[in-house]
Amino acid sequence: MTTGNKHLPTTTVTPARVRLFQPTQRPASRAGEWIETSWGKCKVDGRLGQRHADLLEAILYCAERARPEDAGTLKLLIDPARVRQVMSDDRYSLQQLWRLLRELRECTIDVETPTMHIMGGVIESAEHTEELTRRDPLTGGERRLWTVRLGKAWVELMRLDLPLRYDPSPITRLRHGISQAIARHVLTHRGEPQGGWVIDGLIGAVAGDRDGQARRDARRRLREDKAGLVGAGVTVCGDRVHRLRPLVAHSPDGVAHPPDGVAHPPEFSAPLQDPQGLSGP
């Protein structure tokens, strides 16, 4: 089954809303402390940051075949050259991608919302062997393909949560993790509060309470990514953030859109179909 972002979601709305991935490209290892938001809560044993989100979204966006397995995992066929192309402009070696895959495999997530409670792994396994190859037009030789097994917990999250489908390339090219986290958060909303989101409110939504120098640094980094954010469908104007899509205006929520308020409808309103419908030939 050729996906090209047609049959598998790039991600779902909950990870960005419950702060599953730290808003940095250099995440610290977490030891299972709960992070609570009004959309739900999560905890992570391991290391998950925006580069891990980049890779996971790139894998789902580039997956060429998806086959459900009896254990509840989902086996994906991946061309690593396409993943590298989505991830960056020659900034990532295969060894670096493999390190991110290892950290994704080693972590355990626990996500709880009013409609679901899921605990388990993100990736069950990854492998590349000489049995699956493709001609490399640059060298004339063969390059090895990957098979990546999504963990049962992530497969269930895709099945139960609301899917989002977009090209992750513009987000992966942003310089700062805080900008990536804010872009991912904004894209979980179909509409925006009247006047847009206040920057400080979004910083709080993706990074928790920050004040003083930490907040000023976050604002500065977001503005440094202003041009790149436009490619992701997000614009920064003064102290406000807007979506660059047809929007449905919402009434003001007092001050800026409170990061932990009632969720706006997501970009796509139907949950992913049963993974059995994802089988390739």
Q: Which sequence ranges carry the predicted segments?
A:
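Charged, alpha-helix-forming regions
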Residues: 1-281
